[in-house]
Amino acid sequence: MAEFTRGCPLVAHNASFDRGFWFHELEQAGCERDSAHEFACTVLLARRLYPDAPNCKLGTLAQFHALPDMGRAHRALADAQTTAHLLLRMQADLAQRFARELGPLRIEHALLARLQRTAKTALQRCVSDYAGPQLAARSPELATN
């Protein structure tokens, strides 16, 4: 798995739980940690993005957003698929909410990793700080508008 996922960012619902298992298994296999393996956590992101959700359990968030029913909860495949749907929803919601700041940028893993560590009240600034240099590198006139 370490070689298969090399260079890939990882996403999990309640990533602190999964991260521990992941790093333990890498160690047991004698594999080095990949610096790209910074986990984005959909629980941390949901706490910042969806304050109106009843809670941040995966099933609750799936119902809250009317995501497809992927089957029995707490089964690896169903939870992974539900998390993927939730991540796509989060990316779409962020793109819509911060369209002016992000312009043509996609919601990248690096931005998600920053947002999950940002206070709810500082999301706007975090996105602006992230997007500014990205936009300037692509098109100087976009960064100044």
Feature annotation, model-predicted:
Residues 1-49:
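Conserved DEDDh/DEDDy metal-dependent 3′-5′ exonuclease domain
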Residues 21, 81-85:
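Short amphipathic alpha-helical face segments that pack within enzyme cores
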Residues 25-28, 48, 64, 86-93:
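Active-site catalytic microenvironments for nucleophilic, acid-base chemistry
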Residues 29-35, 67-73, 95:
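Short, polar/flexible loop-turn hinges at active-site or ligand-entry regions and domain interfaces
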Residues 36-40, 72-80, 100-104:
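Short, surface-exposed recognition loops or helix-turn segments adjacent to catalytic cores
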Residues 43-81:
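Active-site-proximal helix-loop-helix substrate-binding element of RNase H-like nuclease domains
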Residues 84-145:
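Acidic two-metal-ion nuclease catalytic site recognized across multiple nuclease folds
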